[in-house]
Amino acid sequence: LYPTLLVKGAPLAANPGDWVPYDTEIAANVVADLKEMVPPWVRIQRIQRDIPKHQIIAGVMNSNLRQYARRELKRRGKRCACINCREVWRARIDPADAELRTRSYEASGGTEHFVSFEAGRKLLAYMRLRDDEQATVRELKVTGQAARLGAEGSGVQHHGLGAQLMGIAEEMSNDFGRLRVTHGVGTLEYYRKLGYELDGSYVVKGL
């Protein structure tokens, strides 16, 4: 979410017309309004552009606009449901308390399934499964600190939530006969251990 900033050299600086920039208070209220509306399968990655203050002519000068928006939400008695605000990170949560949730919605000619393990409002792990002509896992993530492949430990990433989500994806995609996964180079070995094979830009498993 990037409120407009007027920077040096921009065409708007020479001809602003009726444009009036947001100040920090107004911008925080607008961002808080948007955060109230965001569904739980959306991630708000960034709020406010990271532009050096000396280059800004007009607009929000505070780089911590997200904190201002959170303060405004707290004042309203509301919370943001976006992924970024619900991830576990360093919170102490027992994965055994996780509840499986599935939220489905139509998008771009197909059906998206956001399948997650949650404890209260905290998000422990999630997967995005898309059904159109094929079944595709577009994203799989276990929140918290990253776990090295094969390592042992007690954190969220060591409880097999990712593998459980992949098993659920396979069950949901059974009618398609196969499941493909968008993957990164560093996760190829992980998917191979789950029975997937490299096929072009995806890893694929017959069902």
How does the language model describe each region?
Residues 17-35:
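Phosphate/diphosphate-binding loops
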Residues 185-202:
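Conserved active-site alpha-helix within GNAT-family acetyltransferase domains
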Residues 1-22, 41-67, 142-152:
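Flexible glycine/acidic-rich beta-alpha junction loops that bind and position SAM and/or redox cofactors
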Residues 171-183:
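Conserved GNAT acetyl-CoA-binding A-motif
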Residues 44, 137, 184:
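Conserved, mostly hydrophobic/aromatic
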Residues 180-189, 207:
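Conserved beta-strand-loop-alpha-helix junction that forms the acyl-donor binding cleft
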Residues 97-98, 103-145:
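A conserved beta-strand-loop-helix scaffold within acyl/acetyltransferase catalytic domains
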Residues 153-172:
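Conserved acetyl-CoA-binding loop-helix of GNAT-fold acetyltransferases
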